[in-house]
Amino acid sequence: MLNALGVICSGRLVQTDFQQISEVQYLINIPEADNVNHVVVFLTGTTPFAEGMAGAVYFSWPDPNAPPTWQFLGYISNSKPSAIFKISQLKKLDEMSNNSAVNVFGANLPISHIAQIGVSIEPESNLMQQTPATTTTDTYYQFGQKMVENFFNFVSSFSVTQSQMMPNPNEAFVPLSTVQTWFTNFQRRLQQNPSFWKS
């Protein structure tokens, strides 16, 4: 299986140097992962998966203070030999989750500053029932972030100094610093829990 798997990061050469860490688990390092937004994981065509099997694809961001934690991205199979995965928001989500992702590739792996892609060969029927855990959270986070930025930019476009203000007893004014404080607090809460607004 070593030469049967490949990874492409935008603007980089194809990587096929997976390392086998167990009979059914393979890892590859992604250097300078902060500059990577999407990865393509694929079968090279040299060796197909065994009948009924597929490759679960996991991603791990580096954490200098802890062993790798793995986030399920999706899977590839003989009938779906490649997949594109968005990873740009996974680092933020991993930090927010306080490393709640499962360490499926062993607890004894050394701490790494290089991101990794892991492929675990598993029954395809099991993988078809799984969905990436970060999809909904990622969408909420992105929507909330864009909405707050849009609101802040809109309000800021109307800012004037006190000397430019026209007295109007029927108009209420809010200092821009108050909006800035709200914006900062909202962003912090959104990073801690993208679904906080539901409660």
UniProtKB/Swiss-Prot annotation:
InterPro entries (alphabetical): Hikeshi-like_C, Hikeshi-like_N, OPI10
GO molecular function: Hsp70 protein binding; nuclear import signal receptor activity
One GO process term, biological-process aspect: protein import into nucleus
Pfam families on file: Hikeshi-like_C, Hikeshi-like_N
GO cellular component: cytosol; nucleus
Similarity-based family: Belongs to the OPI10 family.
Identification of the protein by name: Protein OPI10 homolog
